UniProtKB/Swiss-Prot annotation:
This is Elongation factor P. It holds the Pfam family EFP. It comes from Bacillus anthracis. SUPFAM superfamilies: Nucleic acid-binding proteins, Translation proteins SH3-like domain. Belongs to the elongation factor P family. Involved in peptide bond synthesis. Stimulates efficient translation and peptide-bond synthesis on native or reconstituted 70S ribosomes in vitro. Probably functions indirectly by altering the affinity of the ribosome for aminoacyl-tRNA, thus increasing their reactivity as acceptors for peptidyl transferase. The gene is efp. CDD domains: S1_EF-P_repeat_1 (cd04470), S1_EF-P_repeat_2 (cd05794).
Length: 185
C-alpha cells in the first residue's frame, strides 16, 4: 500500500479493479475543508485517461509491473510476435493492444514488454528510434526560410514533419513519445 501523498509521475497503482499509471497529480489544500490529491490516470489495459480525486493520506495498492526485454520479430495478420532474448519464449500481441506503438516498431527491434501477474499489458518503446524515409517531396534549392517543413512517410507508415533538406532513403531519429523528428541518424 502507498499513500496518495507519495504519488509521482509514472507510478502504477491498482484502484477500482483496474491498473492505472499516474500521468499527472496535484496536491490541493483548499482554504476550507480537507486537503486532497487530484490526479490524471491512464488505464493500462484500455488506454483510457481519467481524472480521479483522492483524500489526502488515503492509501492505494501499488501495482508491481514487470518489464521484460524482448525483440519484435514479425507481424502475422492481426498478431505481432515478440521473443524473449533469454528464454527464446515467443508471445503474440493483438493489433488493438499495441495500436499506438505499431507506428514505431520494425523487425528485430528491442522493446520492453510490461506484464502484471503474468498478464501482458503492452509495449514500452525506447525514447527514440531510427527509421528510414520512404517517401517525401524533394527540397527546393534556395527555399531556406526559417523552420520550413514538409511531410515524410517513414518505413513503418508513420508520417512526420521534417526539414526540407531531408531526402528519400535517409535515416532519421524519431521521438517515440511525441512522434516527431529529432535529427538525422
Amino acid at each position: 500500500m502507498i499513500s496518495v501523498n507519495d504519488f509521482r509521475t509514472g507510478l502504477t497503482i491498482a484502484v477500482d479493479n483496474g491498473l492505472w499509471q499516474v500521468l499527472d497529480f496535484q496536491h490541493v489544500k483548499p482554504g476550507k475543508g480537507a486537503a486532497f490529491v487530484r490526479s490524471k490516470l491512464r488505464n493500462l489495459r484500455t488506454g483510457s485517461v481519467q481524472e480521479k480525486t483522492f483524500r489526502a493520506g488515503e492509501k492505494v495498492e501499488k501495482a508491481h509491473i514487470e518489464n521484460r526485454r524482448m525483440q519484435y520479430l514479425y507481424a502475422s495478420g492481426e498478431a505481432h510476435v515478440f521473443m524473449d532474448n533469454g528464454t527464446y519464449e515467443q508471445i503474440e500481441l493483438g493489433e488493438k493492444q499495441i495500436e499506438r506503438e505499431l507506428k514505431f516498431l520494425k523487425e528485430n527491434m528491442e522493446v520492453s514488454i510490461m506484464t502484471y501477474q503474468g498478464e501482458v499489458l503492452g509495449v514500452e518503446l525506447p525514447n527514440t528510434v531510427e527509421l528510414q524515409v520512404t517517401e517525401t517531396e524533394p527540397g527546393i534549392k534556395g527555399d531556406t526560410a526559417s523552420n520550413v517543413t514538409k511531410p515524410a512517410t517513414l518505413e513503418t507508415g508513420l508520417v512526420v514533419q521534417v526539414p526540407i533538406f531531408i531526402n528519400e532513403g535517409e535515416m532519421l531519429i524519431i521521438n517515440t513519445g511525441e512522434g516527431k523528428y529529432v535529427s538525422r541518424a
